[in-house]
UniProtKB/Swiss-Prot annotation:
This is Protein FdhE. InterPro entries: FdhE-like_sf, FdhE_C, FdhE_central, FdhE_N, Formate_DH_accessory. The gene is fdhE. The keyword Nuclease does not apply. It comes from Escherichia coli O9:H4 (strain HS). Belongs to the FdhE family. Necessary for formate dehydrogenase activity. One of its GO terms (cellular component) is cytosol.
Length: 309
């Protein structure tokens, strides 16, 4: 099953009602999103062997919060949604949608916000990005979207992605359409932008007990039923792994049919759990899954594969 975004004026009244039963999509709620992520990263940094890197990621997340409100995006996506709906494509498809210069404006604003907080190699990286040409930055963005990680150093990628993510999240937040679920292919990718998930979460509140995958780019969440591989949609050979016990708030769901895994975070076990922060802070579980022979089916926006990985 895939999820297609339907323009508002094409939805009948019955579709509007049924769409409210199980929301197939949860568009990004940007208010305090990055501040919450930064706070969670700082909290998880305590007594964590990755503490320094988690605090570094928290600085980027906080900068995203500041830049988000200093540089709002105004854009009418109505025509784009209609066109994408007719083609059966994500409206903000990273492989098709032309990038506006706004994302590079966001990158420069992030660099300006982060410079006073950075030193050593990290400062050298953002100064290098600051001096890069417009075309060089576009080439790096294209390489990341094509999963050509060998073309973008892993120390530059988080900064480039942070700006791209802000831009795509702003656009996703402006989508004036609704979404409905219909059968199709490639449910493992974000139905809004076509990017990969970072993790999945079993939620509380109005979506109690439902699993949503969280996009690592536009921050949209989309519904995928539990006990089904989010990568290949098979259900016969799933296994669940944790470092603590069966009641752990973070587990890895592995699939022997496709040989991949994705983390599942349980809000009922820890209401403060956060899709990006807790995924990054639990890399020990990733190491265990790699030892077991499984490949990760997601990418964390603060941790990209380097050349040869």
């Amino acid at each position: 099953m895939s999820i297609r975004i339907i323009p508002q004026d094409e939805l009948g009244s019955s579709e509007k009602r049924t769409a409210d039963m199980i929301p197939p999509l949860l568009f990004p709620r940007l208010k305090n999103l990055y501040n919450r992520r930064a706070e969670r990263l700082r909290e998880l940094a305590e007594n964590n062997p990755l503490g320094d890197y988690l605090r570094f990621a928290a600085l980027i997340a906080h900068a995203q919060e500041v830049v988000l409100y200093d540089h709002p995006l105004e854009m009418d996506l109505t025509a784009r949604i209609k066109e994408a709906s007719a083609q059966g494509k994500p409206p903000l498809d990273i492989h098709v949608l032309p990038r506006d210069k706004h994302w590079q404006k966001l990158l420069m604003a992030l660099i300006a916000e982060l410079k006073p907080e950075m030193s050593g190699p990290a400062l050298a990286v953002i100064e290098n990005l600051e001096k890069a040409s417009t075309q060089e930055l576009e080439d790096m963005a294209s390489a990341l979207f094509a999963s050509d990680f060998s073309s973008v150093s892993s120390d530059k990628a988080p900064f480039i992605w942070a700006a791209l993510s802000l831009y795509w999240a702003q656009m996703a937040n402006l989508i004036p359409g609704k979404a409905r679920a219909e059968y199709g292919e490639q449910r493992q990718y974000c139905p809004v932008c076509g990017s990969m998930p970072v993790s999945s979460m079993v939620q509380i509140g109005t979506t109690q007990g439902l699993r949503y995958l969280h996009c690592n780019l536009c921050e949209t969440e989309w519904h995928v039923v539990r006990v089904k591989c989010s990568n290949c949609e098979q259900s016969g050979k799933l296994h669940y792994w944790s470092l603590d016990d069966e009641q752990a708030a973070i587990k890895a769901e592995s699939c022997d049919d496709c040989g991949t895994y994705l983390k599942i975070l349980y809000q009922e076990k820890d209401p403060k759990i956060e899709a990006v922060a807790d995924d990054l802070a639990s890399l020990v579980l990733d190491a265990r899954m790699e030892q077991e022979g499984y490949a990760r089916s997601s990418i964390n926006p603060f941790l990209f594969p380097g050349e040869g990985e």
